[in-house]
């Protein structure tokens, strides 16, 4: 007999660090989700930019089933075939020489920051330890990464915090020029600030970061947890900007819904991570890396990446026309299928209210702070699903504006 699982169990049994929707999704296919009552939703969230190829993609499912019958976990005392294949694929398709695998974006950023600190200490001495990040950025929930992130609301309750971390204004050339010094070991930046408002970097800003890091012997880290794996219409966003980092972090869409994180870097930097300096129990496990291999084999095709750019134009055109009718958004921005719609002054602070109404109308969407709706659908979302999702968003907006 099937157990009747209730939404109220969340409050009864689970630590309350999340505030989930009142419905429970139980089934999904492509860009559609169904809850316990059979209600259908169009998914414009993609599990927060995770479900890069939608839900239950048949090729990912087949790959996982194939690997399940072979080997699940062996531990880091051994390597395995899927992880070696994935490392080779990433190295051959990016700037990197070496790859490290873990389980999440936070772990990937933790590894990147530790690597940068150790590289600087080994090469230049322990006084070269400052990490520069940017206001409104988000890099994870570990104590190190949450402190490096530029949103104090996430770190203020956990003092004492890691030290020698500086937060500067994003897209501000003068601020970084004035502050960076010989004591800076790394600069970490999101090519598009995601959680903090969907704000793309100015090309000149990223180019200047590269120049300054070279001048002061600091490492440039691109956090591509959210922008990577085709999200912007390129395999990684750095490729569009034409700015090569020293370290890149990837997660979310890399596993297409299966947990995985990766840190990519150059040979001379990776060399400081000798056995025992860093590690992971589950990172690089055969199941996750098998699925990630299949994701990359599908995403890194010209047809799919071109399709992301086409969907960007289509989505933004439809969203702009919707906004002309209601004048609710002051700004539409983003790249590829990482899009933000900032509420006009009269509606600021109410993004969550609007996404709640959207859910009632059968649309799953995200927020990026109190004022911004964020959309990160599957890279292969059907155009008909974009149309239907925006119809449902319009229904929510009609209720929202009263």
Swiss-Prot record:
Segments crossing the lipid bilayer: none
Any Gene Ontology biological process: arginine catabolic process to succinate
Protein EC: 2.6.1.81
Catalysed reactions, as listed in the record: N(2)-succinyl-L-ornithine + 2-oxoglutarate = N-succinyl-L-glutamate 5-semialdehyde + L-glutamate
Cofactor dependency: pyridoxal 5'-phosphate
GO MF terms held by the record: identical protein binding; pyridoxal phosphate binding; succinylornithine transaminase activity
Gene3D superfamilies: Aspartate Aminotransferase, domain 1, Type I PLP-dependent aspartate aminotransferase-like (Major domain)
Domain of life: Bacteria
Family matches, as NCBIfam families: arg_catab_astC, argD, PRK01278.1, PRK05093.1, PRK12381.1
Annotated function: Catalyzes the transamination of N(2)-succinylornithine and alpha-ketoglutarate into N(2)-succinylglutamate semialdehyde and glutamate. Can also act as an acetylornithine aminotransferase.
PANTHER family according to UniProt: AMINOTRANSFERASE CLASS III, SUCCINYLORNITHINE TRANSAMINASE
Family indicated by similarity: Belongs to the class-III pyridoxal-phosphate-dependent aminotransferase family. AstC subfamily.
Protein name: Succinylornithine transaminase
Organism: Photorhabdus laumondii subsp. laumondii (strain DSM 15139 / CIP 105565 / TT01)
Taxonomic lineage of the native organism: Bacteria, Pseudomonadati, Pseudomonadota, Gammaproteobacteria, Enterobacterales
Gene of this entry: astC
């Amino acid at each position: 007999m099937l157990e009747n699982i209730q939404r109220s169990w969340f409050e009864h049994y689970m630590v309350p660090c999340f505030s989930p929707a009142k419905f429970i999704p139980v089934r999904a296919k492509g860009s559609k989700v169904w809850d316990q009552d059979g209600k259908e939703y169009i998914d414009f969230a993609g599990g927060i930019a995770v479900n890069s190829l939608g839900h239950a993609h048949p090729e990912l499912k087949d790959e996982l089933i194939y690997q399940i019958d072979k080997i699940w976990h062996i531990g880091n005392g051994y390597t395995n075939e899927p992880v070696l294949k994935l490392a080779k694929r990433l190295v051959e398709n990016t700037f990197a020489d070496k790859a490290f695998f873990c389980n999440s974006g936070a772990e990937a950023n933790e590894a990147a920051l530790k690597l940068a600190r150790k590289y600087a200490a080994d090469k230049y001495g322990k006084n070269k330890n400052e990490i520069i990040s940017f206001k409104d950025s988000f890099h994870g929930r570990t104590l190190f990464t949450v402190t490096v992130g530029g949103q104090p609301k996430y770190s203020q309750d956990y003092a004492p915090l890691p030290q020698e971390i500086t937060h500067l204004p994003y897209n501000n050339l003068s601020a970084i020029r004035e502050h960076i010094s010989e004591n800076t070991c790394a600069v970490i930046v999101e090519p598009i600030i995601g959680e903090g408002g969907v704000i793309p970097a100015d090309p000149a800003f990223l180019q200047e970061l590269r120049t300054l890091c070279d001048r002061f012997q600091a490492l440039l880290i691109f956090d591509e947890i959210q922008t990577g794996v085709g999200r912007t219409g390129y395999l990684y966003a750095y490729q569009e900007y034409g700015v090569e980092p020293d370290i890149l972090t990837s997660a979310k869409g890399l596993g297409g819904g299966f947990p995985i994180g990766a840190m990519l870097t150059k040979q001379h930097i990776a060399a400081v991570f000798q056995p025992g300096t860093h590690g992971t129990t589950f990172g690089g496990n055969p199941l996750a890396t098998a699925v990630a291999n299949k994701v990359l084999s599908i995403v890194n095709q010209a047809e799919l990446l071109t399709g992301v750019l086409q969907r960007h134009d289509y989505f933004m055109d439809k969203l702009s026309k919707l906004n002309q009718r209601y004048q609710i958004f002051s700004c539409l921005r983003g790249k590829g299928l990482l899009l933000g719609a900032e509420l006009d002054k009269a509606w600021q602070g109410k993004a969550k209210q609007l996404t709640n109404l959207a859910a009632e109308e059968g649309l799953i969407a995200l927020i990026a702070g109190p004022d911004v709706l964020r959309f990160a659908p599957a890279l292969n979302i059907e155009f008909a699903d974009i149309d239907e999702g925006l119809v449902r968003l319009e229904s929510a907006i009609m209720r929202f504006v009263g």
